[in-house]
Amino acid sequence: QQRFPQRYVQLVITVDHVMN
């Protein structure tokens, strides 16, 4: 049972890449 959905995690990763 994951607290954060995988799609949310992928979105955060994408935003992190864009910010970086």
Curated annotation (Swiss-Prot):
Its cofactor is Zn(2+). GO terms for cellular component: extracellular region. GO terms for molecular function: metal ion binding; metallopeptidase activity. One of its GO terms (biological process) is proteolysis. It comes from the Eukaryota. Its EC number is 3.4.24.-. Keywords: Hydrolase, Metal-binding, Metalloprotease, Protease, Secreted, Zinc. Transmembrane segments: none annotated. The keyword Hydrolase applies. It is found in: Secreted. Signal peptide: none annotated. Residues 7-20 form the Peptidase M12B domain. Binds 1 zinc ion per subunit. Hydrolyzes alpha and beta chains of human fibrinogen and human fibrin. No activity against the gamma chain of human fibrinogen, human thrombin, bovine serum albumin, ovalbumin and hemoglobin. Has anticoagulant activity on human plasma and protects mice against death due from experimentally induced platelet thromboembolism with an ED(50) of 40 ug/kg. On the 2D-gel the determined MW is: 43 kDa. This is Fibrinolytic zinc metalloproteinase. It comes from Ganoderma lucidum (Ling zhi medicinal fungus).
